[in-house]
């Protein structure tokens, strides 16, 4: 019997796969527990519609990520952060990704998740720093961060 898996079943199939399984296994285990449903015409057309919707959603996310990448990598987009610094232009403390995201939201009204900022270690010195941001699996942007000493 051909079935469409609704959930991942270890050793048998992943969600959305169409496979041939023994009739008894399909009726008594998979279908009864909601792990799969019979692969008839209506179920197949529903699966195809879900796949098309998923592809459309993926394309929209990619387009949004590319648009955001253009806005972030624009020459005018420089995130300025004011911090206390010593004489040797080293900061008292550091600037983590959370602070960069908050400054970006405050200055340019661009909301980002702090986990997308790929900062290997917090910024500890004054000046310009290019910070990579993973917007999508295929799209990575660079934010220019300018750390300025706080006037006393």
Curated annotation (Swiss-Prot):
<keyword id="KW-0694">RNA-binding</keyword>
<dbReference type="Pfam" id="PF03948">
    <property type="entry name" value="Ribosomal_L9_C"/>
</dbReference>
<dbReference type="InterPro" id="IPR020069">
    <property type="entry name" value="Ribosomal_bL9_C"/>
</dbReference>
<protein>
    <recommendedName>
        <fullName>Large ribosomal subunit protein bL9</fullName>
    </recommendedName>
</protein>
<dbReference type="InterPro" id="IPR020070">
    <property type="entry name" value="Ribosomal_bL9_N"/>
</dbReference>
<dbReference type="InterPro" id="IPR000244">
    <property type="entry name" value="Ribosomal_bL9"/>
</dbReference>
<dbReference type="GO" id="GO:0019843">
    <property type="term" value="F:rRNA binding"/>
</dbReference>
<keyword id="KW-0699">rRNA-binding</keyword>
<dbReference type="InterPro" id="IPR020594">
    <property type="entry name" value="Ribosomal_bL9_bac/chp"/>
</dbReference>
<comment type="function">
    <text>Binds to the 23S rRNA.</text>
</comment>
<dbReference type="InterPro" id="IPR036935">
    <property type="entry name" value="Ribosomal_bL9_N_sf"/>
</dbReference>
<comment type="similarity">
    <text>Belongs to the bacterial ribosomal protein bL9 family.</text>
</comment>
<dbReference type="GO" id="GO:1990904">
    <property type="term" value="C:ribonucleoprotein complex"/>
</dbReference>
<dbReference type="Pfam" id="PF01281">
    <property type="entry name" value="Ribosomal_L9_N"/>
</dbReference>
<dbReference type="InterPro" id="IPR009027">
    <property type="entry name" value="Ribosomal_bL9/RNase_H1_N"/>
</dbReference>
<feature type="region of interest" description="Disordered">
    <location>
        <begin position="41"/>
        <end position="61"/>
    </location>
</feature>
<dbReference type="GO" id="GO:0005840">
    <property type="term" value="C:ribosome"/>
</dbReference>
<keyword id="KW-0687">Ribonucleoprotein</keyword>
<dbReference type="InterPro" id="IPR036791">
    <property type="entry name" value="Ribosomal_bL9_C_sf"/>
</dbReference>
<dbReference type="GO" id="GO:0003735">
    <property type="term" value="F:structural constituent of ribosome"/>
</dbReference>
<feature type="compositionally biased region" description="Basic and acidic residues">
    <location>
        <begin position="49"/>
        <end position="61"/>
    </location>
</feature>
<keyword id="KW-0689">Ribosomal protein</keyword>
<dbReference type="GO" id="GO:0006412">
    <property type="term" value="P:translation"/>
</dbReference>
